[in-house]
Amino acid sequence: LKPDDLDSRMFLGDLTFYIHQAGERFALRMKDKNSRLRQEFAGLRWYPIDPAWRVSAHFVPYLSPREVPIEGILGDRSTLPMAGYVTFDLHGSYYKLEGLQDDDGRLFFIFNDLTRKTDTYQVRFLFSTPPANGTVELDFNEAYNPPCAFNPYTTCPLPTPGNRLQVEIPAGEKRYH
């Protein structure tokens, strides 16, 4: 396969097939417009937006991306290139998150927090603003669930031990069921 082939889709009735690449692995994925999961889906649920969960963070870039081992929700393992980490203050305590950097310069965080026990999925994703003068903005109101929160057949990366925050962050997307 070539990178251009990854956008190819094939249709068969209500089914859509496409190639998904995760690291060096390829998978054939299928979407079914009439699946039970889709029919029973009642919509997304979010915490009310709260400006208190928008924080400035100090970004510390690595000299070169650091390959970090990541475990997937289905037990698979891969590595991801972490660009650096951010430190930030929440209610008087400091926290740290490692993140990847996308082509637009934004940082991408795979994290969880203590709300995973009651209200949120066990992993959430969050983008920051691109770093400017060593600072990024984290808006936890925009934290969202990965695909595996909705479909047990989807693989997703789990947070590294350092990205499992020992604080409740009641902001962003909740579990949908």
Task: Describe every region a protein language model picked out.
Residues 13-78:
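Surface-exposed beta-loop interaction hotspot
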Residues 8-12, 86-89:
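Short acidic-hydrophobic surface loop/beta-edge motif
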Residues 22-25, 98-106, 124-130:
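A short, sequence-level motif marking secondary-structure junctions
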Residues 15, 24, 91-95, 134:
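Short acidic/polar mixed-charge low-complexity motifs
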Residues 1-3:
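Forkhead-associated
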Residues 32, 59, 101, 113-115, ...:
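A mature extracytoplasmic/lumenal domain signature
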Residues 41-49, 116-117, 123, 129, ...:
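Extended, aromatic/histidine-rich regions of cofactor-dependent oxidoreductases associated
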Residues 77-120:
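Mid-length scaffold segments of soluble, non-membrane domains
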